[in-house]
Amino acid sequence: MRLAEFVTSASVAAIVTDPRLPDNPIVECNDRFLELTGYSREEVIGRNCRFLVGPGTDPARRKMLRDAIEAQRPVIVELLNYRKDGTPFLNSVMIAPIFDSEDSLVGFVGSQLEVSTEE
């Protein structure tokens, strides 16, 4: 199974970014990501995930994501993100690096899962 097929068939919101391009933009996303965020595919592809950040997003948690990306290591972080309509949602974000056969970084795969705040 190719990575793009995996992402599009994943049961959770998922994206692929390309760190070889300026600003590590999203190059693939699935329908669940679009449903979760309220954006269209055209609004997502080519952008860095920062468009989901808003006033309540914790800078320390964002730094955890940035540090893991810079170190090319997997990470899971819960943070407050924002949908296109401005509504916040608690998001469990998993990011993992993708390496080619020569161990060169070629991308990151990310999954997003809305975390319920109800007890």
Task: Give the label of every model feature segment.
Residues 1-31:
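Sensory modules in modular signal-transduction proteins
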Residues 12, 75-77, 84, 89-93, ...:
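PAS and PAS-like sensory/regulatory domains
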Residues 17, 96-98, 113:
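Output-coupling edge of small sensory domains
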Residues 19-20, 80-86, 99-101, 104-118:
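PAS-family sensory domains
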Residues 33-44:
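PAS/PAS-like sensory domain cap-loop motif
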Residues 45-56:
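PAS-family sensory/regulatory domains
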Residues 68-73:
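Soluble sensory domains of the PAS superfamily and closely related sensory modules
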